[in-house]
Design a protein with these regions (language model features):
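Short, non-transmembrane amphipathic alpha-helical segments
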Residues: 7, 11, 47-61
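Solvent-exposed beta-strand sheet faces enriched in polar/charged residues
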Residues: 23, 33-35, 69-71
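A short interface-forming secondary-structure element
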Residues: 33-46
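Conserved loop-to-beta-strand segment in the C-terminal subdomain of adenylate-forming
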Residues: 28-32
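C-terminal structural segments of small proteins and small subunits
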Residues: 53-83
Length: 83
């Protein structure tokens, strides 16, 4: 069974992340917030595709569901300045 920490590690091994937080407690369903400079200039679909590419075959084999919020560093900064 996969842990949230393992999933974070898999993503950060293949994607530059300024911030990442993965939650999940059943080993197959996860929620993630991922902030990466690699998302700059990309649509949300392209950002998600980049995360899927970072996970490779794990998306088909180990992970049943991944709900994610992807943000550029600038968007993350704006979000945090509002709070």
């Amino acid at each position: 069974m996969l842990s949230a920490q393992q999933l974070e590690t898999y993503i950060t091994q293949n994607l530059v992340c300024d911030h990442i937080k993965v939650l999940g407690d059943d080993g197959t369903h996860f929620e993630a917030v991922i902030v990466s400079p690699e998302f700059v200039g990309k649509s949300m679909v392209q950002q998600h595709q980049r995360v899927y590419a970072a996970l490779g075959d794990r998306m088909r084999a180990e992970i049943h569901a991944l709900s994610m919020r992807t943000l550029t560093p600038e968007a993350w900064q704006k979000l945090n300045n509002k709070n």
